[in-house]
């Protein structure tokens, strides 16, 4: 009989209920390099100590249940249990705490974002002892991140495929998002691409509806891409949304896109699910397709600052599951995004190594050990006057996506695309020559518009458009 077995036998089994904190709150624990670390914003119910609330979260997401069970004696709980190792109050908030938790790596299936989230957030958010709970951050150890393929290609490979360097990429979502026939949809794509955009895009809910079946849309968009490439000499693409009701149908659509010779497909990764997304990412790497990711449904999960999952966690999960682009807010447009927080998760998407920085919402140092990076996509309510700020905020490794800011041009889609391309090139040139985009941005756009009637018309249309609301998600 092993010493471990003898110890368990000597303790014996005592039925009943005991406080979680007696087992799962371990303030003396020293985290291991292989642990997955999590930071939870915990709001306990009145009368519930923060140590008990934090330990309850750990128990339910690892080895615990509501009562003592005799099968606890058949394994080593000390090896497999999650541990709440630190709790700190949230400044300026009453009865709210950040609880830090360490999970042993053996609790998780290799290469499965689905299993990771099922374990960490799958059941605990409904606990009665908690008024609210939010997952604010994760530290993914190299030992776990190396079990994931990650993005199909990554930033450098994408630039090499497109032969485009030294500037952000330009995109446009085709509008109206629903109701166009496939041929008219393809015409809109062609006009935008020939005007100077790098990409056009299906919107998130364009799948295969009665007014435009997916196969027809794919064919007409491929024709538009080929024609625009022939006219401009540039490589072009359209994000063909492969999201479908089943994984099999999704892959079938991706296969058809590859057969048409297009460079990129798209997936709604939250509504489609992480298992489907990872499957599509693997197919895209094996078959040379780039993968654009839309985050439809994210605000249901991340909008409330006290409950849910912060988008920085969803962004990390996407980098693991796989995607070459992902929408990341704009800071300046119609969709919410506070600058420091947004740039925090943009770095988590693009960089190899990111230092802990609570001022930007980064709770843990993250080492991706060369997992390919993801291009952040700025999209939502942006137009030519935003171009200097977007270029300064997001830098070259980004996609700036103008939907209404292209298609709403008074002269049509192609002039709208020209206006955006001229504005971008002017901002990049000014920056490269030492200009200050933050201070001189409006003047740079005005000067460029003297030489571009398309840009001048766009400047006139959108000169008064602003989206000035207080961001809900603050540190």
UniProtKB/Swiss-Prot annotation:
The modification N6,N6,N6-trimethyllysine is found at residue 14. Keywords: Acetylation, Calvin cycle, Carbon dioxide fixation, Chloroplast, Disulfide bond, Lyase, Magnesium, Metal-binding, Methylation, Monooxygenase, Oxidoreductase, Photorespiration, Photosynthesis, Plastid. SUPFAM superfamilies: RuBisCo, C-terminal domain, RuBisCO, large subunit, small (N-terminal) domain. Substrate binds at residues 123, 173, 177, 295, 327, 379. GO terms for cellular component: chloroplast. It comes from the Eukaryota. Residues 1-2 form a propeptide. One of its GO terms (biological process) is reductive pentose-phosphate cycle. The keyword Acetylation applies. Mg(2+) binds at residues 201, 203-204. The active site is at 175 (proton acceptor), 294 (proton acceptor). It catalyses: 2 (2R)-3-phosphoglycerate + 2 H(+) = D-ribulose 1,5-bisphosphate + CO2 + H2O; D-ribulose 1,5-bisphosphate + O2 = 2-phosphoglycolate + (2R)-3-phosphoglycerate + 2 H(+). Heterohexadecamer of 8 large chains and 8 small chains; disulfide-linked. The disulfide link is formed within the large subunit homodimers. PANTHER family: RIBULOSE BISPHOSPHATE CARBOXYLASE, RIBULOSE BISPHOSPHATE CARBOXYLASE LARGE CHAIN. The basic functional RuBisCO is composed of a large chain homodimer in a 'head-to-tail' conformation. In form I RuBisCO this homodimer is arranged in a barrel-like tetramer with the small subunits forming a tetrameric 'cap' on each end of the 'barrel'. Belongs to the RuBisCO large chain family. Type I subfamily. This is Ribulose bisphosphate carboxylase large chain. It comes from Notothixos subaureus. The lineage of its organism: Eukaryota, Viridiplantae, Streptophyta, Embryophyta, Tracheophyta.
